């Protein structure tokens, strides 16, 4: 069974919910108050692709504060995918994504990097200030995946990473496999399908592995 590392970088303004998206994907948890990321940290989670191949996501959480922006460029090296996150209630976060983050990725990332846009905090739709159609059109311009997400309710979180895995692996169907606590992840062969399965290890393996960067 082969294992391939797959580097994903999340970028966007401070406070848009990058850390919360990762925490929800890795641990299925949400915290109202999270300290802003300084520098960058990464977490890991594996997906199982067709034929039993394992894609090990290395998910990098980067700082959105202006004073750390110059550091972000180094995280794009060898990245397979970049997710630009904006807050649907903050028009400024969308404009910065268009005018700054998209250009930073273009100038510093590998040519064939997979792009995705996460329209986060969809649970606050009544406070939305960003037109979704405009955001979707921008995603089309970049040939980027577009997913509306809520780190609080978990809406769209798995879909975001599923779509990235599909685009990379060529899979056409997605099955999320939730493991019972303490159960070891298993690879199940499925004939005549292209499937990516999100693996959810037991509690002893469930906490994200993080490395600090200063």
Where are these regions (language model features)?
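Conserved beta-strand segments of the P-loop GTPase G domain that flank and frequently precede/overlap
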Residues: 59-60, 83-87, 117-120, 149
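Post-Walker A alpha-helix
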Residues: 22-23
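Conserved Switch II/interswitch segment of TRAFAC-class P-loop GTPases
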Residues: 79-98, 109-112, 122-129
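Conserved P-loop small GTPase signature centered on TRAFAC-class small GTPases
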Residues: 1-15, 19, 49-54, 111-214
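Switch I (effector-binding) loop of TRAFAC-class P-loop GTPase G-domains
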Residues: 27-54
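WD40-repeat beta-propellers
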Residues: 58-60, 93, 100
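Switch II (G3) loop of P-loop NTPases
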Residues: 54-68
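Conserved alpha-helical scaffold flanking the Walker A/P-loop in AAA+ ATPase domains
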Residues: 43, 69-74, 105
């Amino acid at each position: 069974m082969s294992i391939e590392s797959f580097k994903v970088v999340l970028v966007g303004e401070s406070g848009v919910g990058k850390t919360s998206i990762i925490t929800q994907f890795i641990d299925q948890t949400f915290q109202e108050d999270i300290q802003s990321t300084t520098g960058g940290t990464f977490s890991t989670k594996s997906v199982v692709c067709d034929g039993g191949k394992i894609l090990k996501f290395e998910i990098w959480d980067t700082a959105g504060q202006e004073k750390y922006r110059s550091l972000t460029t180094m995280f794009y090296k060898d990245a397979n995918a970049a997710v630009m996150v904006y807050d649907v209630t903050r028009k400024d976060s969308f404009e910065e994504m268009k005018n700054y983050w998209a250009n930073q990725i273009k100038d510093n990332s590998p040519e064939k990097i997979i792009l995705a846009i996460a329209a986060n905090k969809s649970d606050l739709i009544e406070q939305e200030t960003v037109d979704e159609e405009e955001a979707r059109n921008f995603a089309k311009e970049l040939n980027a995946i577009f997913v509306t997400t809520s780190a609080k309710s978990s809406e769209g979180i798995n879909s975001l990473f599923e779509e990235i895995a599909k685009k990379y692996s060529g899979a056409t169907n997605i099955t999320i496999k939730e493991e019972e606590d303490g159960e070891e992840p298993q690879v199940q062969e499925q004939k005549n399908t292209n499937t990516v399965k999100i693996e959810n290890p037991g509690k002893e393996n469930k906490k994200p592995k993080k490395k600090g960067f200063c």
